[in-house]
């Protein structure tokens, strides 16, 4: 997030550069980047087809974000979305986080509360005909306070997905009762937290078979905000103005309660955290944590396997961009975009910074590949929030989708080439070497200008083409159904853990086709404030079956399936055999 510092607008916006200089530099950089990446051929531009069906399927959610004259930072940060199957009927349902009202002047220490249905969080149940029904009140998920993010995970291994909702001044854990209702168990579980929480993630950090909870916090902030911007043009303050704060890490005790252990684990380094992604980046069998920090060093916490973590961002080459500069890290995803078996990182940020693509070198370090892949030139003038790798055309290569929009609602006054409202960005992966923008050739959705924030992915209609939901700050949610015409095949995998956590979160799945192997780490986290379909998706290209499906469960058990037919969702139960130490790559 890129706001302003106290003082006049010229000095406050120094990191954004002066308007004329910014335009000249941007043009020069874009031209320079274009020379490093070949112009995509007609064959590279495989157009997608996404259709916004929100209104026709009954989703009328509008995010509530008051816009005050005092420019409280909270009001521009948006909220998240979750795609998950809360009632186990095989169809993805939809949960949307909402804000709360507050006046133009708010006393210090105030926690805004929801005063009516327009401020409720919303749960939409997907019916058999593909439409959605608002079941919020029936489920007991109206919520409280000013909501921000959501994380989905079955923390008690009862087979029902639970919800954790973050916000300002306290968070809420909702236990799924398995009968269409949820119970707020925050106090009993001990996970209420404090401060301004943003993204959260469920992961089994210690391998005991129960999901632990990592909760990011943004900054130390209150309503007695300083004045930032010009005298006649107040703006949202830059995060440099505020002190950092550490995350919260809750160990699952296995009895419905949690113990906060960030300090003991070595995860209490103060940051300005907005996005989280979890993967075993060095393939040592232990989940690691990447934290996207806003305008300071990014964090990569390496799991040492002894119950502690060590922050290795600088050593690994992911703390700064390829020019050695910090950037406004917001959304993040961990995925193997070049199919070499090592999970890579995408971190998006604000305009004039370039989205950061870090390719895993396989030796504990990463290479900054935004330039060589063409990503830098495409994203220089854009501001990204929610972001996910996904294979929209099932060709076996993970593409990129980004929810976009600047944080400053007055940005055009100072920088005419930058925009508060932006189209979503869809980038096609060309064999793990280049990314090309296929949005302009992909229909009306990618011409719309939204104040994009949250983003979740999942196959909403179970047709094998991954869909998406994007939320707007102070605007509607957009359900984007993937109608891309393709002859390619696919395979979806739903894991059911027994020794491992029930969701199989943290498992690494390798699928081999005639073109090689792909790897996916099972997770619901990544992006920004959001939670995606827990099922793993693989594009098989022309193959109608996978030669091999190999699953390394969090327990260490390795399970191998041969000649697995595609074009279906396959449930795989974890076997009870002793762990096999055979590597997955």
Residue ranges of model-derived segments:
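Gly/Ser/Thr/Pro-enriched helix-cap/hinge segments flanking short amphipathic alpha-helices
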Residues: 39, 43-49, 57, 67, ...
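Beta-propeller blade termini
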Residues: 78-88, 125, 146-160, 173-175, ...
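Repeat-based blade/solenoid architectures
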Residues: 59-80, 117, 139-151, 190-201, ...
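Beta-propeller blade signature
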Residues: 119-126, 245-252, 302, 359, ...
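Blade-edge beta-strand/turn elements of extracellular beta-propeller
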Residues: 50-53, 131-141, 181-191, 255-267, ...
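Bacterial N-terminal signal peptides
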Residues: 19-32
């Amino acid at each position: 997030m890129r706001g302003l510092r106290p003082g006049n607008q010229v000095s406050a916006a120094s990191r954004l550069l002066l308007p004329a200089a910014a335009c000249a530099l941007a043009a020069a950089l874009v031209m320079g980047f274009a020379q490093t990446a070949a112009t995509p051929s007609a064959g590279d531009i495989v157009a997608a087809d996404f259709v916004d069906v929100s209104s026709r399927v009954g989703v009328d959610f509008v995010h509530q974000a008051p816009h005050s004259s005092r420019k409280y930072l909270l009001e521009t940060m948006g909220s998240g979305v979750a795609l998950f199957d809360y009632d186990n009927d095989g169809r993805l349902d939809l949960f949307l986080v909402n804000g709360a009202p507050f006046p133009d002047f708010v006393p210090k220490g105030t926690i805004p509360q929801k005063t009516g249905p327009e401020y409720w969080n919303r749960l939409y149940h997907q019916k058999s005909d593909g439409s959605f029904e608002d079941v919020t009140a029936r489920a007991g998920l109206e919520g409280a306070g000013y909501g921000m993010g959501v994380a989905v995970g079955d923390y008690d291994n009862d087979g029902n997905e639970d919800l954790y909702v973050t916000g300002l001044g306290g968070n809420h854990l909702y236990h799924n009762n398995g009968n269409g209702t949820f119970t707020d168990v925050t106090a009993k579980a001990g996970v209420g937290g404090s401060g301004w929480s943003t993204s959260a993630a469920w992961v089994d950090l210690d391998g005991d078979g129960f999901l632990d909870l990592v909760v990011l916090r943004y900054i130390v902030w209150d309503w007695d905000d300083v004045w930032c911007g010009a005298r006649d043009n107040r703006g949202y303050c830059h995060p440099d103005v505020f002190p950092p704060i550490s995350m919260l890490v809750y160990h699952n005790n296995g009895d419905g309660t949690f113990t906060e252990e960030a300090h003991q684990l070595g995860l209490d380094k103060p940051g300005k955290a907005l996005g989280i992604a979890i993967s075993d980046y060095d393939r040592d069998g232990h989940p690691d944590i990447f934290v996207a920090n806003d305008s300071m060093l990014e964090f990569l916490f390496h799991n040492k396997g002894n119950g502690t973590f060590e922050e290795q961002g600088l050593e690994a080459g992911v703390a700064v961009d390829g020019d050695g500069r910090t950037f406004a890290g917001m959304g993040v995803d961990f995925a193997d975009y070049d199919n070499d078996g090592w999970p890579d990182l995408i971190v998006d940020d604000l305009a004039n910074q370039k989205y950061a693509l870090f390719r895993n070198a396989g030796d504990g370090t990463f290479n900054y590949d935004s330039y060589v892949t063409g990503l830098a030139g495409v994203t220089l003038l854009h501001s990204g929030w929610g972001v996910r790798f996904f294979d929209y055309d099932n060709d076996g290569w993970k593409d990129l989708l980004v929810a976009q929009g600047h944080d400053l609602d007055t940005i055009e006054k100072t920088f005419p080439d930058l925009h508060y409202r932006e189209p979503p960005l869809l980038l096609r992966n060309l064999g793990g070497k280049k990314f090309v923008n296929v949005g302009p050739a992909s229909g009306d959705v990618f011409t719309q200008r939204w104040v994009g924030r949250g983003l979740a992915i999942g196959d909403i209609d179970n047709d094998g083409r991954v869909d998406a939901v994007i939320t707007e700050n102070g605007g509607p949610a957009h359900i984007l159904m993937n109608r891309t015409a393709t002859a390619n095949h696919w395979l979806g995998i739903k894991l059911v853990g027994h020794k491992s956590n029930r969701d199989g979160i943290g498992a690494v799945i390798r699928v081999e086709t005639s073109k090689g192997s792909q790897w996916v780490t099972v997770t619901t986290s990544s992006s920004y404030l959001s939670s995606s379909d827990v099922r793993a998706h693989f594009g098989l290209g022309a193959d109608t079956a996978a030669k091999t499906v190999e699953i390394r469960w969090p327990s260490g058990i390795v399970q191998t399936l041969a000649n697995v037919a595609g074009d279906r969702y396959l449930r795989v139960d974890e076997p009870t055999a002793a762990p096999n130490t055979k590597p997955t790559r």
